[in-house]
Amino acid sequence: MSYASARTAGAGLDRIWADLDRQGYALTDEAAIGLPEKFRENFGQTYFNDQTLYRYEGDWPVDRKRARDVIRYQWHDDGLHVEEHDTITITDRAGIAGKRDHVRVMFLRDSQAKELIHTFLNLVPPGRRQADGTFGVNLFRTFTNVVTTPHNDQEQFCIFYIVNRIGGGAETYLYRPEDVPDQGEPTADPVLRHQLDPGEIIIFEDRLFKHGATPLEAPNDGIAMRDAVVCTVDYPGTYLAAAN
């Protein structure tokens, strides 16, 4: 990273940390956190393709394609250390009971993906960082519905990065949990409703909100599509507590 990029990233991190402390979420973009100019184009070409992403029977939305990795990270005095976690299995998530495995992408073998992971983990304010944790990295390509209903991921932080979008809709929303009953419609306006454009990023503290996105809207001359990197800064109970 150049000196100018590092300086920009430092200023961007200060604002992100302040926004997270003040309101529980922060909107930013790839330039503000110091990602290289061609990063999104190169990352999208490498990973958002039919050789990497797969559709799974029983998944929801039914036309979603996906892949996944889980990173084990540790913060030491000399900085951030990362390695591949030994499993990527998810259990009882997104309203689907049981254990599920998806295609694994070994991100740490790729320098650009490793840079993204380091950059995203640095978005977490220093005082909120776990010394030893796991970081879920999901690639989602969606064509109609992005999600089904407002929900929690039951993790510490969520990070969404939009790599590409064709068409409209897909407006990300955050509701206060008390404003979304388990059954029925929200009883108040969302705290945030924002259409994330390619290159934009949101990070939020998961316990403070129920989140989701509106359906994609196809352009007049084609098919809608959104490519997104969806990451979770996991609680220990997701992987590490069970392993210990």
Descriptions of predicted regions:
Residues 1-94:
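N-terminal auxiliary "cap/dimerization" subdomain that precedes the catalytic jelly-roll/cupin core
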Residues 72-134:
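Signature of the catalytic double-stranded beta-helix
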Residues 2-11, 67, 74, 78-79, ...:
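Generic detector of solvent-exposed, compositionally biased contiguous segments
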Residues 31, 76, 140, 162, ...:
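Structured loops at beta-to-helix junctions and adjacent beta-edge loops in soluble globular domains
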Residues 129-196:
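Catalytic core of non-heme Fe(II) oxygenases with the double-stranded beta-helix
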Residues 173-244:
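Catalytic core of Fe(II)/2-oxoglutarate
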Residues 27, 156-158, 228:
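Intrinsic-disorder/low-complexity, polar/charged segments enriched in Ser/Thr/Lys/Arg/Asp/Glu/Gln
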